[in-house]
Amino acid sequence: MSSSISSLASAPTLSTNASTSSIVDQLVQAYVQSISTPVYNMQAQVSSINSTISVYQMLKSTLSNLQTQASDLSQIGTLSPLAAQTVTSSDNSVVTATAQPTATAGTHSISVSQLAKSDTLVSNELTQSGTSISTATGAGTFTFSITVNGKATNVNVNVAAGDTNSTVLSNIASAVNSSGAGVTASVVNDTSTTSRLVFQSTNTGSANAISVADVTGTLLQNVGWTSSVISSRTASTSTGAGYVNTSTSTLDANFTLDGIPIVSGSNTVSNVLTGVTLNLAASQASTANPVTLTVGPDTTAIQTTLNNFISKYNSVVSTLNTDITDTTSTDSSGNQTVNRGSLAGDVSIMNLQMSLENVVMGQVSSAASGGPTSLSAIGITLNNDGSLSISDQSKLNSALTSNPSGVIALFNSSSGVATQLNTMLQQFTNPGGVMDQKINGAQDQVTQMNNMITSMQQSINLQANAMQQEYSAYESTLIQLSQTQSNLNNIWSGMASSGMAV
């Protein structure tokens, strides 16, 4: 019997502690992995749909850019960017000009005999360090008025006893410049010891002739601007007060346009030729040849507009080609894999691609009589990849110069290229349009799938927790059994050592 006791005492103990916990964790993790496959698959689907959403958003952006360009080109009349006009001058040193789309093409002759000038009023020459002004006026605040273009402005100037002429002139200039009277005042040091006060009208022309008068005191009178000097527009001299231009008529620009004499108070003239602004730069001798102004289509600006249109159209084509075309890749072993386009099989997108090609390749039934009826007629053709390019620059240049209205109608008439594109693309890019429907539908799908993923993960977590608890209970039982075994082993060992028989 002692041998039996010895056998019991030496029986293997039940395994517990850290090794059991590790095994339990591994079992639970393996179980979670085995039932998480649907979650992983759905997460992959969500990632794929999100990629598709990004593709839709990028496509919508490129379509919107083209739609905006098409909308501009479909504008009627002078609103069309293709109606841009320009003016060339045979002598830019005499006159330049700019044109709005409302300008009428044609040639004009202009001769400039006099430029518009600002009115200039100059004071007496005064010794800078002298006190003749302050001595004559005495100390105090003095008011004078400045009248320009029918508006009188009162100006107040403080004079202190003993102020030098330099100080008084500076104070007058400062007060005038902050008055908003339409006059710029400055002090000119004509010698090292003398100065003169100068008033100059801000704007040119006889309407802006300067008139000044003392209101209180004799401040202006003491710089030489007496009432007689002002009323008679006395000419200034090297030392005496007066006007640089004694006649107000010399303040206006004088020119002839197409033989018609014109007087303007400004050298910038925008009310003579419709849509044209003249910029007079220099007067001419009476014997000089007239300057020729030519108004016509701004081919440079129009070319830029057409290039922008082609660029935006080609961006759409490039995006569509990438999104709906399957590609084939070959690995190092020569195995080929077909990569499906992100939007391959999307019928509405594929139809859009075909519709775009039909518009830019088709004939425009509403084209102007005698004008181009297709893009190819002005040198713009379709390439093999569906993109547009200017294949014949000379043909385009000829169309822009010989029939600009026909080119405009090719785009903006009722069935014009831009009109058709604008109508078509609005269906895709407008709020709630095709692209928004696709994006919103895909986003709703992602939301639903994410909710399902959350629900499945919660279920998996519950199952994992239940399994963890079950194994924990099993481990607790093992610990109790192990303790019982240990106690029994101790008892049997004690009995065996005392020689007790059982």
Predicted regions: what is each one?
Residues 1-47, 68-196, 200-320, 342-459, ...:
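Bacterial flagellar/type III secretion structural subunits and associated motility module proteins
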Residues 190-195, 322-342, 466, 487-498:
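Acidic/histidine-enriched alpha-helical segments
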Residues 52-54, 59-62, 87, 113-115:
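Acidic/polar N-terminal loop/beta-strand segments that form early-domain functional surfaces
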Residues 60, 77, 183, 324-327, ...:
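Secondary-structure transition/capping residues
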Residues 367-372, 473-501:
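C-terminal low-complexity, acidic/polar tails when present
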Residues 43-46, 50-53, 57-60, 67, ...:
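Alpha-helical coiled-coil heptad-repeat register
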